[in-house]
Swiss-Prot record:
Protein name (database record): Zinc finger protein 813
Domain of life: Eukaryota
Species per Swiss-Prot/TrEMBL record: Pongo abelii
Known role: May be involved in transcriptional regulation.
Zn finger spans (C2H2-type): 215-237, 243-265, 271-293, 299-321, 327-349, 355-377, 383-405, 411-433, 439-461, 467-489, 495-517, 523-545, 551-573, 579-601
Amino acid sequence: MALSQGLLTFRDVAIEFSQEEWKCLDPAQRTLYRDVMLENYRNLVSLDISSKCMMKEFLSTAQGNREVFHTGTLERHESHHIGDFCFQETDKDIHNLEFQWQEDERNGHEVLMTEIKKLTGSTDQYNQSHARNKPIKDQLGSSFYSHLPELHIFQTQGKIDNQVEKSINNASSISTAQRISCRPKTHISNNYGNNFLNSLLLTQKQEVRMREKSFQYNESGKAFNYSSLLRKHQIIHLGEKQYKCDVCGKVFNRKRNLACHRRCHTGEKPYRCNECGKTFSQTYSLTCHRRLHTGEKPYKCEECDKAFSFKSNLKRHRRIHAGEKPYKCNECGKTFSQTSSLTCHRRLHTGEKPYKCNECGKTFSWKSSLTCHHRLHTGEKPYKCNECGKTFSQELTLKCHRRLHTGEKPYKCNECGKVFNKKANLARHHRLHSGEKPYKCTECVKTFSRNSALVIHKAIHIGEKRYKCNECGKTFSRISALVIHTAVHTGEKPYKCNECGKGFYRKAHLVCHHRLHTGEKPYKCNECGKVFNRKTHLAHHHRLHTGDKPYKCNECGKVFNQKAHLARHHRLHTGEKPYKCTECGKVFNQKANLARHHRLHTGEKPYKFSECGTVLN
């Protein structure tokens, strides 16, 4: 491939596309085109060749493609001195159009080329003020064109319809306007436009990158093409913050950071999500928000391969692997991996409950607790079990429920090895070993290991019996007692002994009965060493040592150590005889008396005298 090299002006390297040709380029090619053309223009601006005529060249080129080219960064105005002349950059004017271009590009709109014409008048004003009303070309004379940047293009033979091969060795005798008027427009057909663009622009891009970086920072050793970039880099190292907010006084090291910060005060949110319409004050926030719609999770944990939508979430997650807990509570010294967790924890010390239910006025320390509570009013149960279809208002409740299907019991007692499917059940069980009874009755100072037991106990003091039997009208303070009582009417005894087939109303009764077959007596008296198969029997026996008789007769004042003894004694005052013989109809006030009487009918004599062999009933 034959290459021809020539020293050209900005207009000579400008490429024009028709509207149809421009649409054929992908975004990456458009960006590359924009960056290189702007770089070429800036090289001319640095020598103040951005006269009105040259600016119109740039504008007409841009207008043909209906795109505005932006650097993406805002650079501070600087001055370059060549002899006695000062040349000011026009980056600020270019940046003023940057935001509008980004907005139109994001929304898919065509850029209005009338906006960029604002740049046209700026160069004329500068020429008048800095060159004593004389154009810079006249000031420099014949040396003017020696300052032109060497912009080389390599033309691919046979791929350009109307190539213009011009040398500007005699540029001093030809005016800029003449060069513009005599230069034919170069159009690129759709067949080879993309290939030519890549070849031309990439070559120029490489020249820019290969250019010597003459501005170096001694601290970091980093070099830059422009002194403005070096100045920005120095600000980062020095911690210099020269842009101050007029409202709150906060300072920033970049002007664009200050502009973003000001939106916090004004409430301006110029960036809008096309999916849901939500608006944001920063373009970065919009970018992160869009990932919620796309499901994109670009941040991946190297330890467990878990992915996240936000970099901050990945940073917090990494603390789990590292065990890092940088946030410490000043009250109790407890540490946390997240600052939000520390904030919530502090409310335990302050008692603050900032979240209030609008329905009932109840307050909560955590927002999640309020959300769960609110479902009690709405009846919402969004969490569903895939096994049985049961729904729950809390995700934790569903998680515990699933263990019923899987049989998982992850919580183990360190004392006896017993396992549980709920952490709360393990905590209650642990109190059996420690003897802890944190729930105290305010009426009688009695303590309990479970809150539910305390609630049941309180019903004794207030005499409340909310649960009523529909058969006989008898009331109970516990629903479990009502269920057991109902079995008396139905005759149902669902708990059956596998040894003898005897049935029981309650499971606890079956457990106690089973010890008669096994001979197990797990309850031992610490005073005399006597053992019992029931806990209630041990409690009754213990009163023999203490002399405690808590049950008192209201009629005669006699006291008893067992409730059953008081009930039996009370029948002497009332004359009640609830036990009736089915054979002869005789009634008795004690069950033991009925049992002895019943042997008269059966002839049973279970008691035998060992000395003489006499049997008695």
